[in-house]
Amino acid sequence: MQTKVVKIDPFQIDENEMKEAAELIRKGELVAFPTETVYGLGADALHPEASKKIYAAKGRPSDNPLIVHICKFEELVSIAKEVPTQAEKLADAFWPGPLTMIVWKNEKVPYETTGGMETVAIRMPKHPVALKLIEESGCLIAAPSANTSGKPSPTEASHVKLDLDGKIPMILDGGPVGIGIESTIIDLTEDTPMILRPGYITKEMLEEVLGEEVKIDPGIIASDSLTKPKAPGMKYKHYAPKADLVLVDGEAENVVKKINELVAEKQKNGLKVGVIATDETKDQYQADIVVSIGARADEDAIAQHLYKILREFDDWNVDAIYSESFATPRIGQAIMNRLLKAAGHQVLQV
């Protein structure tokens, strides 16, 4: 299969190119497209065979649910068994945007899309290309990240092509994404709403809108993979570069000292070592490759650069990677959640 890459201006969308992509979706084929979070790999969410193609192209376990992308709230109503009042409040506040809600599904949604679950994850993306594709196709679009399962999520079309070239018919190239990490996922099927995946929309933001407590699933920081995942990203190793990644957490001075010791040890054995640092510390490391993820206080930049940097280390063929910890106040939990999964929960406290 030849993969067609179509450059598309998000602010001046070519109708003919979008019609071609929409027709592929209607035929049960796959199209990769930009969202404000990461690039998604889309197919008709209500077409069981189309959803199966997503799992096959990504090498994704079939019990890992897909997020259904919509362009209007009525589409949530059309596939939900019931619509919690919380869903309406959250949609008013955060949609379109990087928030996914889990509700009970009705019979329209195939189990191939929900990973065998009785619940369905739903989001209205903010990116104009994503919204136009949903509208033009007339389909609800199931879309996980457009990458090989387990690898860092794609924040540019080139990342999608690297992973899925020859496996899907089309990639819509809308340029680099804005946020860089996946949406927050909130489960609305329990008595108390619960965050199953942290993201740009924080617990505090959700609680302010809902006027009630929002819990955080312990699995966000745990490494247990025995339970059935209710949301994408909960069970399997994700976001991982080829090289072994270890996080080093502690006071900045101690972290720099420890990482340099670890780097020296690896280099003695002839290994090529990379370090993920910040603007404040990048000049203090003696690794083969040192990359700054941004200023420590700039959470948005850290989130936006994370996956791109992990992929760049693959290009540089490093043997080991050490990273500072980025437990910042606002979206730091989301950033650390992704890093912990990428590192297979390998953390050194110093």
Q: Can you name each region flagged by the protein language model?
A:
Residues 1-350:
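Active-site-adjacent structural elements in enzyme catalytic cores
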